[in-house]
Swiss-Prot record:
This is Valine--tRNA ligase. Keywords: Aminoacyl-tRNA synthetase, ATP-binding, Coiled coil, Cytoplasm, Ligase, Nucleotide-binding, Protein biosynthesis. CDD domains: Anticodon_Ia_Val, ValRS_core. It is an enzyme of class 6 (ligase). Residues 805-876 form a coiled coil. It comes from Staphylococcus epidermidis (strain ATCC 35984 / DSM 28319 / BCRC 17069 / CCUG 31568 / BM 3577 / RP62A). It is found in: Cytoplasm. It holds the Pfam family Anticodon_1.
Length: 876
């Protein structure tokens, strides 16, 4: 197959993915003699199109599974999507609201049909994006969290945990979204610093002797106060414990109680307790058997318990209440105060801690098992390892999980209430006399079904399902470090509880994709990047390679168009090297013609040695998920060694008369390029398939080609050492030419003084490389040479490289030129130094600008030192 003259990603990628899918290349072989390898995709939400974070996440998964497929594993990369309860419902409701329709106008059944329509529309977009990224997914196994099979798994888990007493229904403080009117999980609450106030109020003692000072940021909740607590070790309040105060406005008598929760140093050291509107207060209330008084309704408006404030919005109530307290001279002071306030991720509403009857999971027994498992041979390995400590800490500090949501889109809770007796029935199927029962209207938290993802997607609860037996446990989970607790931990404890095995062997955690300046990408900042736009401009291979190699595990990634463009340049370099090679290999050269047993040149032996070292490095680093290091190893070998050196060196035999030497060079070019394509394939699937199809090869597709392995017979360490010496000499000559302003096209005398006879003979044996790359008018190589008085000498491993300067340059003129350049560099250094010593600039300028100036400073300093050194050398 002929390669086009220019690399065009659109041309290269067009139709290729459809070809892979239609030929079934991504389906597991199901060959029982092979070891199975499985990754299930972290299911994207069907709320919208995929962002750069998804592209990063799935690219890493695809790299791993493509590599494992090539290494001979029976590989399954399973696709799927998440119904994303509150997020999708909010999107569908917003769409309906544009038409002036609410979900209640439609009713549950019709609303759910709208949600399913939304799901189908966005699932199509997501599949199109997966295709553009080139993900090797087996679509015949695609799953959705509301599929029948997964719904069955959800019901079984709920019922089993309920029967074990781990799931229960009760009153607890939950995150309440008054706009969406539903409970929220902790991950659906975004904490933002808000400018508010600390209100200091007087709570008069019931006996009329003074008051106790209470501070709060939420005055509206004081209407639900049921006690005051102080620390029993606080000397200020020892005499008032057991007394009572009068709750302002309401007039209710509140006891003063002792509780060690209170921080003596914070505020006045006395704290109001509102058990129905604060999680910590609720715990205190439980310890002291306090009444729970709810003062708001589900809309965030004050209810009957709020007396004259009934019907007011909670924040309007706050303002009015403070005004009324001022009139009663009960306000001591109001301080400005910045504090963290929870907002609903979906609706943006300020979240209200709210006492509500919900369904909960007791987390302690499940978390303990997950912790204990980390001390067994079945432990899960975290990459980077530091995240295991994060996981353990969260498991140790875990609280019960609110799993019910006041939504329609999701898994409806499999609990029914008897119409007459109120009896609760929990079962995988509805009661037989269904006419006497009403099903709980709430649905389960999205994370409840997501927690079952690694095994529910493979056929569980049918433990005899072929896929479950073959592909579970999965091998690796790749996801962001921000959801270790919300998703990773839950999959671990549910996997252990219901399958008695870890759900995955490894957890590879990456960070967040940030803008170039380090800020988080967001719609409000307008700095988001659509991965599909990047692919349209630079191709999927460029984006994939950048995402995979741009950071190390566990770290954030700064998106940079410049860096994506540099990957495009790298691919273009590979394309041109492949075209050159193919032109020299010739159309008639077949894979059977590859013969490395002939007379290999020094360059051949060197590149084959470096190829084997690179194969070893890439394989080893990939097993540790160190793809940033893999990227560097591949780039250095391909760009610096294969393209810049070997391709150029191969021109010597290819332009010569020795046919057998030409044939050997063709073999080496073909062999090395084949291995390069295979190593690059997981990162750059499209361009490598195109180039590989043009090379002499066996097999239908590179997707199923064998991963390269080290061939000890093709490692020539002595030749590698010799080539390193030659390359150092050539680089030294070229650098010296630059320093004395002499182009490579001008032939000049070159002297090489070697350390010993062996090196001398080695260099003499390979003198053709020195002639080609140094362009000497006269080349002297010896252990003893007379170094001219005026000469430029560089020390290298092999000895010394000397360039006589007599007649080469006008010394005085060159020194004058360099001194002028030195003055310019000094001016630039002074300017940068002045800028960086300016406190105003350093404190106010963006980090990116400061770093740019520091880089300039380093660059100018290095150039200054180099020019100064050249002047001194010339003067000497």
């Amino acid at each position: 197959m002929e390669m086009k003259p220019k690399y065009d990603p659109r041309e290269v990628e067009k139709g290729r993915y459809e070809e892979w899918v239609s030929n079934g290349y991504f389906k597991p072989s199901e060959d029982k003699s092979k070891e199975a390898y499985t990754i299930v995709i972290p299911p994207p939400n069907v709320t919208g199109k995929l962002h750069l974070g998804h592209a990063w996440d799935t690219t890493l998964q695809d790299i791993i599974t493509r590599m494992k497929r090539m290494q001979g594993y029976d590989t399954l990369y399973l696709p799927g999507m998440d119904h994303a309860g509150i997020a999708t419902q909010a999107k569908v409701e917003a769409k309906l609201n544009e038409q002036g329709i609410s979900r209640h106008d439609l009713g549950r059944e019709k609303f759910l049909q709208q949600a399913w329509d939304w799901k189908e529309e966005y699932a199509t977009f997501i599949r199109q994006q997966w295709a553009k990224l080139g993900l090797g997914l087996d679509y015949s196994r695609e799953r959705f969290t509301l599929d029948d099979g997964l719904s069955k798994a959800v019901r079984k888990v709920f019922v089993d945990l309920y029967n074990k007493g781990i799931i229960y229904r009760g009153e607890r403080i939950i995150n309440w979204d008054p706009k969406a009117r539903t409970a929220l999980s902790d991950i659906e609450v975004i904490h933002e610093d808000v400018q508010g106030a600390f209100y200091h109020f007087k709570y008069p003692y019931a006996d009329g002797n003074g008051y106790i000072e209470i501070a709060t940021t939420r005055p509206e909740t004081m209407l639900g106060d049921t006690a005051i607590v102080v620390n029993p070790n606080d000397e200020r309040y020892k005499d008032v414990i057991g007394k009572t105060v009068i709750l302002p406005i309401v007039g209710r008598e509140l006891p003063i109680l002792a509780d060690e929760y209170v921080d003596i140093e914070f505020g006045s050291g006395a704290m109001k307790v509102t058990p129905a509107h604060d999680p910590n207060d609720f715990e205190i209330g439980q310890r002291h058997q306090l009444e729970n008084i709810i003062v708001m309704d589900e809309y965030g408006k004050m209810n009957d318990k709020a007396d004259k404030y009934k019907g007011m919005d909670r924040f309007d109530c706050r303002n009015q209440l403070v005004k009324d307290l001022k009139e009663q001279d009960l306000v001591i002071k109001i301080e400005e105060h910045t504090h963290s306030v929870g907002h609903s991720e979906r609706s943006g509403a300020i979240v209200e801690p709210y006492l509500s009857t919900q369904w909960f999971v007791k987390m302690k027994p499940l978390a303990q098992r997950a912790l204990d498992n980390q001390n067994t041979k079945d432990r899960i390995d975290f990459f980077p390892g530091r995240f295991e400590n994060t996981f353990n800490r969260w498991m140790e500090e875990i609280r019960d999980w609110t799993i019910s949501r006041q939504l329609w889109w999701g898994h409806q809770i499999p609990a029914w209430y008897h119409k007459d007796t109120g009896e609760v029935f929990v079962g995988e199927e509805a009661p037989e006399d269904i006419e006497n029962w009403i099903q709980d209207e709430d649905v389960l938290d999205t994370w409840f079904s997501s927690a079952l993802w690694p095994f529910s997607t493979l056929g569980w609860p049918d433990t005899n399902a072929d896929d479950f037996k073959r592909y579970y446990p999965t091998n690796a989970l790749v996801t962001g470090y921000d959801i270790i607790f919300f998703w990773v931990a839950r999959m671990i404890f549910q996997g252990l509880e219901f399958t008695d095995r870890r759900p995955f062997n490894d957890v590879l955690l990456h960070g967040l994709v940030r803008a170039e300046d380090g800020r988080k990408m967001s719609k409000s900042l307008g700095n988001g990047v659509d991965p599909m736009d990047v692919i349209d401009e630079y191709g999927a291979d460029s984006l994939r390679y950048f995402l995979a190699t741009g950071s190390s595990p566990g770290h954030d990634l700064r998106y940079s168009t410049e860096k994506v463009e540099s990957v495009w340049n790298f691919i273009n370099k590979i394309w041109n090297a492949a075209r050159f090679s193919l032109m020299n290999i010739g159309e008639d050269f077949k894979v059977e013609d590859i013969d490395l047993s002939g007379n290999l040149s020094l360059a051949d032996q060197w590149i084959l040695t470096r190829l084997n070292e690179t194969i070893s490095t890439v394989t080893e680093l990939s097993d540790k998920y160190e793809f940033g290091e893999v990227g560097r190893a591949l780039y250095n070998f391909i760009w610096d060694e294969f393209c810049d050196w070997y391709i150029e060196m191969s021109k010597i035999p290819m332009n010569g008369e020795d046919e057998s030497q030409k044939q050997t060079t063709r073999s080496v070019l073909s062999y090395v390029l084949d291995k390069i394509m295979k190593m690059l394939h997981p990162f750059m699937p499209f361009v490598t398939e195109t180039i590989w199809q043009s090379l002499p090869h066996h097999g239908e597709t590179i997707v199923k080609a064998n991963w390269p392995t080290v061939d000890q017979a093709l490692i020539f360490n002595e030749s590698k050492q010799t080539m390193e010496q030659l390359v150092e000499i050539i680089k030294s000559v070229r650098q010296s030419r630059v320093e004395v302003n002499t182009p490579l096209s001008k032939a000049i005398p070159i002297l090489i003084q070697t350390k010993d006879e062996k090196i001398k003979h080695t260099l003499m044996d390979n003198i053709s490389y020195l002639h080609k790359f140094c362009n000497p008018s006269q080349l002297t190589i010896d252990t003893e040479i007379e170094i001219p008085e005026k000469a430029m000498t560089t020390v290298v491993v092999a000895g010394k490289v000397v360039l006589p300067l007599e007649g080469l340059i006008d010394m005085d003129k060159e020194i004058a030129r360099l001194e002028k350049e030195l003055d310019k560099l000094q001016s630039e250094l002074d300017r940068v130094d002045k800028k960086l010593s300016n406190e105003n600039f350093v404190n106010k300028a963006p980090e990116k600008i400061i770093n740019e100036e520091k880089e300039k400073q380093q660059h100018y300093q290095e150039k200054y030192n180099g020019v100064k050194s050249r002047i001194e050398q010339l003067k000497a």
